[in-house]
């Protein structure tokens, strides 16, 4: 099993060679998360390793954005951040949050199960702000990357 086919890898590798200041890589499933039993790149260790090597070798700033978890969280591995956000329309019920506590060594801050969305702010060439917000626009988590 694979996540990306040969042509998709070639395309992605070519994008990492372009002259850009920042790469925002969006995935339908989580890239950094390791400790849950749902869909994630970690279920495909060879592919995840290949992607993380591509990111590291590019020597470019990269922000990861993912979803499909019905929760929100920020993950960090070395200097690589992932903003996972969903959802405004299908949050997990509150009772499930109370009995199911997910942990992950790469988790920064808390997991949020209520309605949420993510924001990536590019302040200038030296500051990126990742935010998780609730349905009222209140900040749940915030990370400033310099």
Predicted regions and their residues:
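Metal-dependent phosphoester/phosphodiester hydrolase catalytic core
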Residues: 1-146
């Amino acid at each position: 099993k694979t996540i990306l086919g040969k042509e998709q890898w070639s395309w992605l590798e070519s994008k990492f060679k372009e002259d850009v200041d920042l790469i925002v890589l969006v995935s339908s499933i989580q890239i950094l998360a390791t400790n849950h039993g749902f869909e994630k790149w970690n279920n495909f260790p060879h592919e995840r390793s290949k992607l993380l090597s591509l990111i590291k070798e590019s020597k470019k700033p990269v922000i990861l954005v993912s979803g499909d978890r019905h929760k929100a969280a920020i993950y960090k591995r070395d200097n690589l951040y992932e903003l996972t956000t969903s959802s405004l329309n299908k949050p997990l019920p509150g009772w499930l949050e109370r009995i199911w506590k997910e942990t992950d060594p790469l988790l920064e801050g808390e997991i949020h199960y209520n309605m949420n969305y993510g924001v990536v702010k590019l302040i200038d060439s030296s500051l990126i702000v990742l935010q998780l917000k609730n349905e009222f626009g209140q900040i749940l988590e915030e990370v400033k990357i310099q």
